[in-house]
Amino acid sequence: MHWMLLVSLLLLLWLLVASPRLAWLKAGLLSLFLLLLSAWGLVDRLSGDGINAATLYHLRADMDGAGVSDFSGYIAVFVGMLLLSLSPLLLVRIRRFQRPRGGGAVFAGFVGMLLVGIAASPLYRDGKRLYYQLRPVDYATVVPEYQVPQQPLHKRKNIVWIYGESLERTYFDEQVFPGLMPNLRAVATEAVDVRNLASTEGSGWTIAGMVASMCGVPLTTAPGDENSMDRMGMFLPEARCLGDYLKDQGYRNHYVGGADASFAGKGRFLSSHGFDVVHDVHYFQDQGVAPKHFSAWGVHDDVLLDDAWDTFQTLSRAGQPFLLTTLTMDTHHPAGHLPSACKGQQYDSPLGDIGLLHAIKCSDRLIGELVARIRNSRYGKNTIIVIASDHLAMPNDLSDVLAKQKRENLLLFLGEDIAPQQVVTRAGSTLDSGATLLQLLEPGMRTLGFGRSFLASDAPPSASAAASRDSGKDYPRYLAYARTLWTGRSTRMLRINGNGDVVVGVQQVRPPVLLEYDKDTNLKTVYLENTSRQFDRTHSKGTLAYVDRCTAFEDGSADGDWCALVVDRHQSMKLYRDPDLARGIAIDAPLEATQQGPRPRVRQPIMLTQAARKTDAGRYMLELYAKRRPTRAFWVEAVSSERKVVLAQQWVVPDAAGRIRMPVGLEHAVEDLEIRAWLDYTEDVSVDDLALVKDIPVADRS
């Protein structure tokens, strides 16, 4: 298909300059197509699989903590491609190739060839794949397959789970990577060594690999576009994961990782599912670890695994059973990092001097040393060690070599009473890792979520098997069910809790939020970004419920209360207020005392201050200048406490110079005062100068 795409692009360029008719339209369409292809190229270099579930997740999850500097080369190429994508806009100025006639036929040929190019491009392939994965499907048939552990553990052994970043078992191949991983190869001969372990859709990146292995479900985004995860109160609240179960069995769950736990919602996942302690890069920074022991992603693995060893000893001495989970980082794509403990270590490879190979060699040594320490300690006999790759390697400096190999994840189980064996799976994935661990702890247990133990000869149907048969045509049912774990299935009642969060099902969401329901009043989509625009542009056959401050919907609302505007499929509307929302409103109830007519264009808040400021009590005059502002009056307000408490609000009209003056009275000091305006989503305001001037009372001289 690549040759067809190349031919279509060349023909599109020729058709662009062949006729001056509609030249700018043709140039714009071609530039847009090239821009999309450039963006796809960058995403593919990062994900290794084009635009997939991982792409969608990270677009909607917190990117803080990502080692962006590691990808500077990719980004530089992307910027170059962006500039090249704009070249059609320059080509339209070349007139010597243009024919004065035949413009209509040329334009028709251009449109036809553009459609051919799109069909031949990876954009069409990935879009089609995502459509089949994310489209609404009936998941009822797989609901019985989702099983949670219930029976008690009779032997509560300690567990150490070591995730090796991108450390797939493919690196064990002595023909390709001779002597690269001698320590873990030796450990594998004494362990349950699982072979042919795949990564299904929804398990192929770090947080997804952790969710899949610890919960037995693929990770999908919530039914919508949640942003940064901090607007969602809980991470997969309906899932019951390994940490939840072990905590109920009296375990203490402890995580230590080198990267920022906020990245991709990892910390939120762990704290939502039974982990008592989550240590990340900030913990090591607070401990005073020297800067040389950090990379762009976080603390290096030598420091991390030393801390894991210290934590293991501390937890073991306490006498309470525990799960200690750690995640290495230095083998992260594209080139890896080398910690101080391995600076003098080199891996001589026929492939050349490749930094990632040195990092893998180092990781093998450091993990091997930690495993040996644990096994040789007086606590080793009561400990099960799990060594696993979090996912297959992303595009890296060895991608061309790995592409020629049979790829498989790493999964080893090591313990005093665990008989060494190699288990070759026919249709296994990381979804089954947690279930296998549970069977090693308690032989009668074989399932965790959709995961099935590799050691069970008569395991029931699994999501892994569904993903591997018939091109995975039944696997979207498992993805659809996993999506419901964000909110639960009882989502037809909405209410506002005491913290000002919207409670939908079992999830708590910080407004503003737009909920879209289908014609059967099943929750279809949750919009958390650009909600006012989405509300205006969404033409649903079901019901829409938009929750925000009442100021978003009406003029005379200066109390800061919450309101919900509900629009049913007949376009009947009703505005519910704070008392109704505190009690709860039923989305499927008939709307009484409704109004008809076109939907109102709701307002959205726009922050005018750069950052929150601490402000003492007193009377102030807010003065601001805005060169770009609406031509009509609008609301401006002062807010505090994460924008929950409205301190002052006024309907303002800028003067001819764009100046706005507004009194603000504070009865007490405010730690986080912010100023914001309420505008239609088509409007904007740009503040050039803003000052909060305290009124100084004039002394009485009488």
UniProtKB/Swiss-Prot annotation:
GO biological process: glucan biosynthetic process
Single annotated GO MF: phosphatidylglycerol-membrane-oligosaccharide glycerophosphotransferase activity
Segments traversing the membrane: 5-24, 73-95, 102-124
Membrane topology: Multi-pass membrane protein
Any one GO cellular component localisation term in the record: plasma membrane
Localisation per UniProt entry: Cell inner membrane
Listed EC numbers: 2.7.8.20
Catalytic activity: a phosphatidylglycerol + a membrane-derived-oligosaccharide D-glucose = a 1,2-diacyl-sn-glycerol + a membrane-derived-oligosaccharide 6-(glycerophospho)-D-glucose
Pathway: Glycan metabolism; osmoregulated periplasmic glucan (OPG) biosynthesis
InterPro entries: Alkaline_phosphatase_core_sf, OpgB, OpgB/LTA_synthase_biosynth, Sulfatase_N
Key words of the record: Cell inner membrane, Cell membrane, Membrane, Transferase, Transmembrane, Transmembrane helix
Similarity comment: Belongs to the OpgB family.
Function: Transfers a phosphoglycerol residue from phosphatidylglycerol to the membrane-bound nascent glucan backbones.
PANTHER family: LIPOTEICHOIC ACID SYNTHASE (PTHR47371), PHOSPHOGLYCEROL TRANSFERASE I (PTHR47371:SF3)
UniProt-recorded name of the protein: Phosphoglycerol transferase I
